[in-house]
Amino acid sequence: KRQEEVQGMPYEVTLTGVGKINATRVLTEKIVMWDGRKPMLPDIVINYGTAAKCSNRVQVGELYEIGSYIQRDMNVTQLGFENYQTPFGKGTINGGKGDLICATGDNFWEGDTQFTEEYDVADMEAYALASVCETYNIPFRCFKYISDDGDAKQWQENCRKGVELFIARMRLNA
């Protein structure tokens, strides 16, 4: 959301753009140049975004805190790796106070005909942000507003509602 929409809150807002590469690039640049002169790690990174409903543990129209992150578009099982496991890298990243699993991928999740038991929500940035925070040992919290169940039209209609819920939640914690 735009800076002017969160005035009065003690957080600096950074827009990362859509997708894992944008999220990684923008957050890493922000960390490396935190105060404009030298690297200075933030006390915490808080992510807000929308997500698709992938399990019956979440409901469209609600805001949830996420606790674990996987890459849903990483599949090299043919090479002997577990699904969602990056070869010689990270698999599941744990962090945050929630117990839900967010599956990040660089495509719009369209699973409205069948839910999964493997993860609860799908987005396009959280795993990347959690990975950067893990690399720099920065606490990471992630809040996802369930905007749809794999339906792009639902997403467009519901985005604004999620921002309002998130801002209210942050004001309680400020």
PLM regions and their residue ranges:
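Glycine-rich phosphate- or other oxyanion-binding loops that anchor nucleotides, phosphorylated ligands
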Residues: 5-174
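N-terminal beta1-alpha1 ligand-phosphate binding loop
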Residues: 1-3
